[in-house]
Amino acid sequence: MVVPSRVVVVAAPKLVGTGPIQSVAELADYPWLQEIGTNEATRYLEQNGVTKGIRKGLISLPGNLMIDAARDGQGVATLARAFIEADIAAGRLRVLFADDERAGYFLVTPEGVLRPAAKAFAQWVMRQAAAGLGAGY
């Protein structure tokens, strides 16, 4: 695993406030953000009993825009904590729920010897990860 990270449900305090949120169902009145090509938000809602969907809709965005939209208070998002640790520490995002499952990102390469450029890239990725990207796990 290159970057270990729990999946967290987050939102900007200006969207959900600072008070306690006891269940995922309480978030059904907010728009939810989901990365294009994934089903993490939909799956999280279903796993937590919110099967009828959300009243303000599910907005699909590219990953970088999803994080920006969450910071801006445009919706609730399920994200890898490692990529938003600074936002959490600064108070721009609030962790509402955290998944207990250990998850993360892997670097997958084909079997056999890597070409020099691919090997250099893989080594760079590993150095970047070792420099602290996964420190928020």
Where is each model-derived feature located?
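Short leucine-rich amphipathic alpha-helices used at interfaces
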Residues: 43, 61, 111-112, 117
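C-terminal regulatory
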Residues: 1-74, 82-104, 130-137
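Short beta-strand-to-loop capping motifs
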Residues: 11, 109-111
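Short amphipathic alpha-helical coupling segments at ligand-binding clamshell hinges
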Residues: 113-127, 133
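Short alpha-helical linear motifs
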Residues: 104-105, 124
